[in-house]
Amino acid sequence: MIRVPSPAKLNLFLHITGRRENGYHELQTIFQLIDLYDWMTFTPISEDEIQIEGLGEVQLEQNLIYRAAQILRPHAQNPCGLHIKIEKNIPMGAGLGGGSSNAATTLIVLNQLWQCGLTEEQLAQFGVKLGADVPIFIYGLNAWAEGIGEHLSFIDLDQKQFIVLKPDCFISTQLLFSQKTLTRDSKPTTFCAYQLEPSNFGNNFEPLARELYPEVEEAMQYLDQFGHAKLTGTGACVFAEVTDEMNVDDILKHAPCKAYLVHSLKESPLRHFKVAS
């Protein structure tokens, strides 16, 4: 039995800079890993199948964990059936990358457990087929991202704490992308520019999320009283960096929805994962 953490991420900003002919959007963002974890347990079983426990009514063929395992199966030198249990702490549909992280964790663990012998780069190439956020969790380092999110430049970020709010709504990414008022032509920028004035960098999805989802608007207004609230991903989660002036316990206590205090990570706990021999 192997039990490992599967971390979440924040988008410290998110700009859409263009659109490809295939419909995919070009973007720029910073991925910040945080210490909010799902926990995944991998247990070999005698049956030649993948069993998944803990994700409710998600159909197996649509499950990113199952799909990750199926991608690796042809490369397995020592295949075995598995019971995979997931303990969810990262809210779903929140912009925190929980599903992508779970897929990446599955690729990392099974690459060793099944003796696939694939490199980190090969795992990332498989991962991007499952979702644009998956490679960041494969590499397990904070990064400046471009393209559809798959072109990564690893960066060193200061240690910080964040208050994260999860409004009681599920945001449709497709709905936000379909809005004609979505800004799709942000001017490309650089990490150096971000470092000089991070408060100038927002999220192109934020105005739409606030307009279409009153719960997001309420959470943003609440956090804006204490700091600079931002949307992560396409939402629904919003966050603000903790400052010395904040009474964190009081902010968490009176939040209008589920609230978390999280810490930034320099790297994923899976960065140096090894299956015990």
UniProtKB/Swiss-Prot annotation:
Pfam annotation, one family: GHMP_kinases_C
Reactions it catalyzes: 4-CDP-2-C-methyl-D-erythritol + ATP = 4-CDP-2-C-methyl-D-erythritol 2-phosphate + ADP + H(+)
Positions contributing to ATP binding: P91, M92, G93, A94, G95, L96, G97, G98, G99, S100, S101
Entry keywords, A to Z: ATP-binding, Isoprene biosynthesis, Kinase, Nucleotide-binding, Transferase
GO terms under biological process: isopentenyl diphosphate biosynthetic process, methylerythritol 4-phosphate pathway; terpenoid biosynthetic process
Family indicated by similarity: Belongs to the GHMP kinase family. IspE subfamily.
Protein name per UniProt: 4-diphosphocytidyl-2-C-methyl-D-erythritol kinase
